[in-house]
Design a protein with these regions (language model features):
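Extracellular protease catalytic domains of secreted zymogens
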Residues: 171, 175, 179-404
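A short catalytic or substrate-binding loop motif that flags glycine-/basic-rich loops and adjacent residues
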Residues: 11, 106, 304
């Protein structure tokens, strides 16, 4: 099946009630065209950057209900406080309701680097406004790029960049933050940008790099895995928004922590009920090219001889972002990756590279009591969601900072 058709939900992992429309965007910073779908009664709007096209990486985010600017955070979307409450990163009220879960994380060390495409001229101002609104300490942000020429603005990537820096900072506000912008003119984040991000984090003493973009897997990816091997850096990537069986790289790399997507069910009062796999989104797959890494030997009955992913998962929909003077509701594994990266940074276990981090997390499966204390095992949302590791959500989502 054509991967472009599958990623639009017309094949193996359809969105409920999916329909396709191509029309002009009203979102002021969006691309000239977009696709829409409907899921659980919500309109899902994909910017041009999230529509896979041959020869370029794509983002993994979408707007929810509307891509029109709003004067305040959309009603009901998760906040840094509500997400941190559900994941037991902070103390919060019973049920972790969005409206009253206001305590936010306070940790972070070293540095977090975000790799995206194109310049984001209002990055510092937007991050400051977001942080102030939610009571998050101001960020120490540096915007940089490979080489000497500042990249142009890619309007459909601005939502991605806002999402990445705002939520990574929200989870680990004490970490130095870098936004590394690719200077490639075709909007692809380049390996030069990834290498720059890793070097900056390493010079800061260590930390994490988050990459919320990707492309279908190809055989030459084996030669790219070397870019994610810095022993002072743990690399994270989105597992994609296309459901199960749709591959994506760099999420497929055994040297990257691939982050899938979940969804919080809440009652009419906004209280948390449970967390489920986000049906039709939060991609997972067995890599056709990457062999099973040693840290997955314990789940070989599921992955066989292949690298299986995602490794972990985080809430997929929906979050608030602040962009160019306005608020938007947004979702996707583009949210999940920087969020989980920030959580791992704040956990401050300071693993010596991605493989060390993954080895630590997968080792939790051997101790059921420890595993239940440290991860939320997601077993609902699709028939493939099982007890323990699965291709829906990997090991599961965060439960406290332990084991990360």
């Amino acid at each position: 099946m054509n991967w472009f058709v599958r990623i639009l939900g017309l094949g193996a992992a359809p969105f409920v009630g999916f329909f396709l429309v191509l029309w002009g965007a009203c979102f002021p910073a969006a691309a000239q065209s977009r696709y829409e779908s409907v899921f659980n009664g919500h309109k899902i709007i994909y910017p041009q950057s999230s529509i896979p096209q041959p020869g370029r990486h794509h983002t993994n985010y979408f707007f929810v209900d509307s891509d029109a600017p709003q004067s305040s955070p959309p009603s009901g979307v998760e906040t840094p406080g509500s997400l941190a409450c559900v994941y037991k990163l902070v103390s919060g009220p019973t049920g972790c309701p969005v409206a009253t879960s206001t305590a936010v994380p306070t940790g972070g060390w070293g540095a977090i680097a975000i790799v995206d495409a194109g310049d984001y001229p209002t990055a510092a101002a937007d991050l400051a406004a977001f942080s102030s609104y939610y009571g998050i300490p101001p960020a120490d942000l540096t915007v940089t790029w490979p080489g000497t020429k500042k990249p142009p603005v890619y309007s459909d990537w601005l939502g991605e960049e806002a999402l990445d820096i705002e939520w990574a900072h929200a989870m680990a506000p004490n970490a130095k933050l870098y936004l590394v912008e690719s200077s490639q003119v075709n909007t692809d984040p380049t390996w030069a940008a990834v290498q720059l991000a890793a070097s900056l984090v390493a010079k800061a003493g260590g930390g994490v790099v988050s990459m919320s973009w990707g492309d279908p897997e190809v055989s030459q990816e084996l030669s790219w895995d070397k870019y994610f091997t810095n022993k002072k850096v743990v690399f994270f990537a989105a597992s994609g928004d296309s459901g199960l069986g749709v591959s994506i790289y760099p999420g497929a790399s055994p040297n990257v922590v691939a982050v899938g997507g979940t969804h919080f069910n809440r009652d009419s009062n906004g209280n948390f009920i449970n967390e489920v796999y986000y049906t039709g989104g939060g991609g997972g797959d067995l890599s056709p090219f990457e062999p099973r890494p040693s840290y997955q030997n314990g789940v070989s009955g599921i992955v066989g001889s292949h690298r299986g992913y995602p490794d972990v998962a985080s809430d997929f929909c929906c979050a608030a972002i602040y962009l160019q003077g306005a608020w938007y509701s947004i979702g996707g594994t583009s949210w999940a990756s920087p969020t989980f990266a920030g959580i791992v940074n704040a956990a401050a276990n300071k693993a010596k590279g991605s493989v060390a981090e993954l080895t630590m997390m997968y080792s939790e499966l051997a101790n059921p009591i420890e595993y239940a204390d440290d991860f939320n095992d997601i077993t609902q949302g699709a028939p493939q969601c099982k007890v323990g590791f699965d291709e829906c959500t990997g090991i599961g989502s965060a439960r406290t900072y332990a084991g990360k």
